[in-house]
Amino acid sequence: MANLRDIRKKIGSVKNTQKITHAMKLVSTSKLRKAEEVARNSRAYALKLDAVFDDVLSKMKNQGIEDIQSKYFRELERLEIKKVDIIFITADKGLCGGFNTNTIKKVLACTNEYKEKDIKVRLRGIGKKGNEYFSFNGIEVLDKINNLSSMPNYERAQEFMKKVVEDYLSGKTDKVIIIHNGFKNMITQEIRVKTILPIGYQIIHQNPQPSEAQETITSEPSGSEDEILDSLAEKYVEYSLYYALIDSLAAEHSARMQAMDTATNNAKDLVKTLTISYNKARQEAITTELVEINAGVEALK
């Protein structure tokens, strides 16, 4: 009978866990819908910003301005890279499947790839899980910030990028990339690697959706060319990080929703298995008791 009590306890424990994971799935689903809407709107703004870049560059070239002196812009193919900063974005919480692990693996892969080319790499971390991993493994992270990936905030992202831009303009780094797990759809996330500094001319055209972004854009640049481009570049770099944070958050909720759905289904299967084991054990106990009773009756005859 002790075995039956143990199985009953296990069934009760698994059912409680099932309720928790199901509730977490519902919460993640609700948060995902909101995050997806924010990501969609932010994507539209990012396309508008790209369109402004394209429009200004086109007008400058039409005016005969071919050589751009701004430090933000470089021909990436001709640039000699010696130092790279990697900004990675992970979640502040777990229970989201391989969401954080996949990002960390990509960061490590990129780091090793650069080091094989004798390129110095510095890490800048956003998200508790990623920062904890690298800290635990003795890997230095230059800047660490938590509670930003779970609550994207433009001002905090802007403040974070100020240090990055200062290091880039002062020559402490030659290239800055962002690595994060992005939202593709309700059930799929994908690792994204984006170079944000220097801004190569081809980056402006990496989102070829002119009907969505360029249709209503009309810009009249005033002031020096470098001032215009520097101002736009600062906004572009800041918003690139902010959009990555929003994209990452939507992907995180998607991954957690899937993970909790899988956990809930696994709990259901485990309850079924334990219930079968319980019924078998109960039947065996009843059979044993009947055999013992019959044996006792026979002994009394």
UniProtKB/Swiss-Prot annotation:
Entry annotated with the keyword Membrane: yes
Description of how the protein assembles with itself and partners: F-type ATPases have 2 components, CF(1) - the catalytic core - and CF(0) - the membrane proton channel. CF(1) has five subunits: alpha(3), beta(3), gamma(1), delta(1), epsilon(1). CF(0) has three main subunits: a, b and c.
Species, as recorded: Helicobacter pylori (strain G27)
Signal peptide positions (record): none
Gene3D superfamilies: 3.40.1380.10, ATP synthase, gamma subunit, helix hairpin domain (1.10.287.80)
Classification via SUPFAM superfamilies: ATP synthase (F1-ATPase), gamma subunit (SSF52943)
Localization, UniProt: Cell inner membrane
HAMAP family, A to Z: ATP_synth_gamma_bact
Stated name of the protein: ATP synthase gamma chain
GO terms for biological process, alphabetical: proton motive force-driven plasma membrane ATP synthesis
Gene: atpG
Family from the record: Belongs to the ATPase gamma chain family.
UniProt topology in membrane: Peripheral membrane protein
Its job: Produces ATP from ADP in the presence of a proton gradient across the membrane. The gamma chain is believed to be important in regulating ATPase activity and the flow of protons through the CF(0) complex.
Highest taxon of the lineage: Bacteria
InterPro entries found in the cross-reference section: ATP_synth_F1_ATPase_gsu (IPR035968), ATP_synth_F1_gsu (IPR000131)
Gene Ontology cellular component terms for the protein in this record: plasma membrane; proton-transporting ATP synthase complex
Keyword match rRNA-binding: no
Keyword terms of this UniProt record: ATP synthesis, Cell inner membrane, Cell membrane, CF(1), Hydrogen ion transport, Ion transport, Membrane, Transport
GO molecular function, one term: proton-transporting ATP synthase activity, rotational mechanism
